[in-house]
Each structure stands twice: as structure tokens, then as C-alpha cells.
Curated annotation (Swiss-Prot):
This is Toxin To15. Beta toxins bind voltage-independently at site-4 of sodium channels (Nav) and shift the voltage of activation toward more negative potentials thereby affecting sodium channel activation and promoting spontaneous and repetitive firing. SUPFAM superfamilies: Scorpion toxin-like. Belongs to the long (4 C-C) scorpion toxin superfamily. Sodium channel inhibitor family. Beta subfamily. Transmembrane segments: none annotated. It comes from Tityus obscurus (Amazonian scorpion). The keyword Cell wall biogenesis/degradation does not apply. It is found in: Secreted.
Amino acid sequence: MKGIILLISCLMLIEVVVGGKEGYPLDSSGCKAGCFFGTNSWCNTECKRKSAAKGYCAWPSCYCYEFTDDSKIWNAKTNKCYK
């Protein structure tokens, strides 16, 4: 039983390490990049431009997957949007 729990824990850790960062890309104001009138393909392009692998429109903001480690993404704790 302990072995199964250890295996599952290792697999979850591998997913976190391999999966990369994900979140909302920043616009020039430090806010989430909006997709109020955008589409999934527009957000996917924006995400790739911001060094992510892919993304989609999670209305009203773009959401990206697999950012590089040095990418800046929106964080609720350090939000400086229009401040």
C-alpha cells in the first residue's frame, strides 16, 4: 500500500516538474492579458508570443500553459495592475 502511494506521489511530482508554469500572461500594464473580444486562436498566438506553448481564452482573460521558467505571469499576491 505504501508503495502505491509513493508511486502516485512520484507521478504527480513528475507532472508538476515536466508540465511547466501556467497562468495568465501579463499585458504592458501588468494586468492579465484580456480576451474580451478575442478568440481561442488569438489567445494561443498571444501565449506563444509570451513564451508559452499554448493557450486559450478563459473569458475575459487569456490562460497559457507551459511558460518558460523566466516568464512573468499574473499573480494575485503581487498584482500591480494599474498601480
